[in-house]
From Swiss-Prot:
Protein name, per record: Mitochondrial nucleoid-associated protein 1
One GO-annotated biological process of the protein: mitochondrial DNA metabolic process
Cited InterPro entries: MTNAP1
Transmembrane feature ranges: 528-548
Disordered: annotated span: 29-88, 130-205, 222-269
């Protein structure tokens, strides 16, 4: 028995000796109900001590139990102090103060000091420091409570006497509409809040000085923090610009860029949205500082012979329109005749696969207002060919759609400088010829006219088909790119060839090879098996070519 005693270990829960305490602890029935919330933290401590001591007796076990009973009130006090700290953090402190809470703990025999330092963001000048000393609470300790310290600190920093209790509800009532406008960013102030009591700390009662501090923090403007006027003026409400706003007027539509308060022109600048029509070509439109620019859009569509129009209302403050700083909404109602009508949307005469071409027309009054006596240059884009022409034309000039091309013609609402037009014209006229080789792969150009989803045979390669009629050449520049440097879609365009005697044999050779290649390509695309075979064969040849070039047969020699 004497040899078996040192091997026995007493379970700290059921107080029974076991040879293998580790195997008993998971199955101990007294472990669950006997453990309280305070013993959860140190439940492994008695087991560890029991394992270290090989011969524990019942006296030692009882002594440990007494120590645990003595430690229980200390743990309860610590838990209450931690709860008190969180209660102080969750109590209704000034909601404008946001920042980091620095917790410094200095433990002593009878004192546990937690220091909360609330630092306000950017504009919040007064710093509030709360020091809490946990001692046995008594009425005498209320004289040095954090509430009194808070009142003293704020009164010293402000240098003004504390307002009466009757002023606090008025300040709160003045703050509440400001809080409602801020999308409920800050919760509304409750003047009669329930007091939240804790150990040695009272912060739930309504403090007029704290209400004043909250009002002072909310008086700081949020929009203009760096301006020198922010300190002198009162509450400045942030007026976010309304990006899209529907107006139930006769014109109807969306007013873009109209602010909620049109009278305040110093702090708001509205940028006009050009609907993606002129941003890519004309760059950014100039925005004047003291100018409210509203842009309305009205789209009325009808079928048949009725007009398809899209009117863009442009309201400006300037010498031409002379609104003189009025509301842009009323300016839109006053002058509806300043709309530019984009109409005369027609289909091309030919039956080819080309998109509709919107042409721009306007009335003489609109020309006199927006353009003056000069004409605004219209930018004409010819998609699918090298002949991108930039011609200064007037509003009255009709644009005719040509076969095989998609003509998109706009008119600029804002005048384009002549240097920009000349620069683009110089770039397009002096464009270098395209690289030889890409014309053998027409599938790389999905925007070319004539390349559809369904495979079809290419048109015959004849010189007669290349010569266009004379009316289509009027007012257009002839491309100087040689025939052999163009793609397959360009070679089928309606432009006469600039042939020379030196390039004639090469042209015939490349024309024959190109014709055979396109025909072979279209026939292979019809059959899926043949296309896959050609694809894998091409990849295999490329891989073999690369391996022979880079490895240089060193691997095969080994």
């Amino acid at each position: 028995m004497g040899a078996a005693e040192p091997r026995m270990e007493v379970c700290p829960y059921c107080k029974k000796p076991f040879k293998r305490l580790k195997s008993h602890l998971p199955h101990c029935k007294m472990r669950g109900p006997s453990i309280s919330a305070d013993q959860n933290v140190s439940q492994s401590k008695p087991a560890a001590l029991a394992q270290k001591e090989k011969s524990p007796t019942r006296d030692l076990t009882r002594a440990k139990e007494k120590e645990l009973e003595v430690d229980r009130p200390k743990r309860a006090v610590k838990a209450e102090t931690s709860r008190a700290s969180w209660t102080a953090a969750a109590s209704p402190l000034p909601e404008g103060i946001l920042g980091s809470v620095r917790i410094t703990k200095a433990e002593g025999e009878n004192k546990d000091q937690n220091q909360f330092s609330f630092q306000a963001l950017s504009q919040a000048k007064p710093e509030v420091t709360l020091q809490r000393v946990t001692t046995p609470w008594s009425p005498a300790s209320d004289a040095t409570s954090p509430k009194r310290e808070l009142t003293q600190d704020v009164s010293e920093s402000k240098g003004s006497p504390c307002p009466s209790e009757t002023e606090a509800p008025s300040l709160v009532s003045s703050v509440e509409p400001f809080l409602a406008n801020q999308d409920r960013k800050y919760s509304s102030t409750q003047p009669h809040a329930n007091p939240a009591t804790s150990v040695g700390l009272k912060l739930g009662t309504v403090d007029p000085q704290r209400q004043k501090l909250r009002v002072k923090l909310l008086d700081v403007p949020l929009s203009d923090r760096h301006s020198p006027k922010s300190g002198s003026h009162g509450v400045q409400r942030v007026t976010p610009s309304v990006l899209s706003r529907e107006e139930g007027s006769q014109d109807g539509g969306h007013l873009l860029g109209v602010s909620a308060h049109p009278g305040n022109t110093k702090t708001q600048k509205s940028e006009s949205l050009l609907l993606g029509l002129h941003t890519g070509l004309l760059g950014k439109a100039p925005v004047r500082e003291h100018q409210e620019l509203g842009l309305g859009m009205e789209l009325s569509q009808s079928k048949g012979n009725t007009e398809n129009r899209m009117s863009v209302t442009n309201v400006q403050e300037g010498a031409g329109l002379g609104q003189g700083g009025k509301d842009p909404i009323t300016a839109t109602k006053a002058k509806p005749h300043t709309a530019l009508e984009l109409r005369n949307v027609f289909m091309p005469e030919s039956g080819n696969q080309s998109l509709t071409s919107p042409a721009v027309t306007s009335t003489p009054e609109e020309n006199a207002q927006f353009c003056g006596q000069s004409h605004v240059p219209a930018i004409t884009l010819s998609v699918g060919s090298v002949r991108d022409v930039l011609e200064p034309t007037s509003f009255y000039q009709p644009h005719t759609a040509q076969a095989g091309h998609c003509l998109m013609s706009y008119s600029a609402q804002y005048p384009v400088p002549k240097t920009f037009v000349g620069h683009v014209a110089a770039v397009t006229s002096g464009a270098p010829p395209r690289s030889v080789g890409l014309e053998w792969f027409p599938e790389l150009y999905p925007a070319y006219v004539g390349l559809g989803v369904l495979p079809r045979r290419p048109p015959p390669w004849s010189l007669a088909a290349q010569v266009p009629p004379l009316p289509t050449l009027q007012g257009r520049s002839v491309s100087k790119v040689p025939w052999w440097g163009r793609s397959s879609a360009d070679s089928r365009s309606l432009e006469p060839l600039t042939l020379t005697t030196s390039s004639l044999p090469l042209m015939r050779l490349l024309g024959a090879v190109h014709k055979g290649w396109v025909q072979c390509n279209t026939t292979i695309k019809k059959s899926g098996v043949g296309g896959l075979t050609m694809l894998f064969a091409g990849y295999f040849i490329l891989c073999c070519n690369w391996s022979f070039k880079h490895l240089k047969l060193q691997h095969w020699r080994k």
